[in-house]
Curated annotation (Swiss-Prot):
One of its GO terms (biological process) is protein quality control for misfolded or incompletely synthesized proteins. This is Peptidyl-tRNA hydrolase. Its EC number is 3.1.1.29. It catalyses: an N-acyl-L-alpha-aminoacyl-tRNA + H2O = an N-acyl-L-amino acid + a tRNA + H(+).
């Protein structure tokens, strides 16, 4: 069993923003599955995938407190770190680029930073989705909370299903395979 966590902010006003790309990938994977409240501040659904069951989680905390929900879900389902994949936005990666890593630093992503602090380890897989632009504003917080332009949305709509495929490959074939196959520019 794998725990797949998509990072985002819970309020409706944050839907379809750069910061909520993790939620978008989780929703794509979930399809018509319904989400339930977990024992902790998160919503989840289970799906069956070629590599076995996947628990899809959306923390209902704000991004910067995502670690609380991740730890609660891991404890509830007794998930080890090697069976965890976190999906998040990354402003330091060009729009439309996927970067999967088996471990590493937060790289300035505050949701990842809190998860690392909460777990006491950087040893978990992450799938970063590039949301950066050429003309980044001085205020990164307003940038990540902004919606994509129409042109950017066309690219993101191509990236989300590729990210979902990468998650399925991570679950069935492992992080190294997913890295080799999916790391790079999608659009």
């Amino acid at each position: 069993m794998k725990l797949i966590v998509g990072l985002g902010n819970p309020e409706l006003r944050h839907a379809a923003t750069r910061h909520n790309i993790g939620f978008d990938v989780i929703d794509h994977l979930a399809g018509s599955s319904t989400f339930s409240s977990g024992k902790g501040n998160y919503r989840f659904t289970k799906i069956t995938a070629p590599g076995g069951p996947l628990i899809l989680v959306k923390p209902m905390t704000y991004m910067n407190l995502s670690g609380h929900a991740v730890v609660a879900a891991m404890n509830f389902w007794k998930i080890e770190r090697e069976n965890l994949l976190v999906i998040c936005d990354d402003v330091n990666i060009p729009l439309g680029t996927i970067r999967i890593r088996a471990k590493g630093s937060a790289g300035g992503q505050n949701g990842l930073k809190h998860i690392i602090q909460s777990l006491g380890s950087e040893e978990f897989a992450r799938l970063r989705v590039g949301v950066g632009g050429e003309n980044m504003p001085a205020s990164l917080s307003s940038f990540v909370l902004s919606k994509f332009t129409a042109e950017e949305r066309k690219c993101i709509d191509k990236v989300i299903p590729v990210c979902a495929d990468a998650v399925l490959d991570f679950a069935s074939l492992g992080v190294e395979h997913a890295m080799t196959k999916y790391n790079g520019q999608v659009c």
